[in-house]
UniProtKB/Swiss-Prot annotation:
Its EC number is 3.5.1.5. The gene is ureB. GO terms for molecular function: urease activity. Pathway: Nitrogen metabolism; urea degradation; CO(2) and NH(3) from urea (urease route): step 1/1. It comes from Streptomyces griseus subsp. griseus (strain JCM 4626 / CBS 651.72 / NBRC 13350 / KCC S-0626 / ISP 5235). HAMAP family: Urease_beta (MF_01954). Keywords: Cytoplasm, Hydrolase. Heterotrimer of UreA (gamma), UreB (beta) and UreC (alpha) subunits. Three heterotrimers associate to form the active enzyme. It is found in: Cytoplasm. It catalyses: urea + 2 H2O + H(+) = hydrogencarbonate + 2 NH4(+). Gene3D superfamilies: Urease, beta subunit (2.10.150.10). This is Urease subunit beta.
Amino acid sequence: MIPGEILHGDGDIPLNAGRPVTRLTVLNAADRPVQVGSHYHFAEANPGLRFDRAAAHGLRLNIAAGTAVRFEPGIPADVELVPLTGRRVVPGLRGETGGALDA
């Protein structure tokens, strides 16, 4: 082994395996692109995005950590969302949740 070397197994590692997936169509009604990061509470995303916010409550994008999805103006996009896990507390952001998701 070389110091700092990372050894990993063969094959792909599935993202969010076993988590329920919610599919929504999102339309960017704004006049410029909007980007949403992997762990952002999707229901509180930019108000220029049109989608079922109630269905997105407590969910985040089903994408790799540290990545984002860019929504171009006027172009509908289908997304997959998975539940936020851990303590399920969302402080701050746009102030619509401001704490525990399950309260």
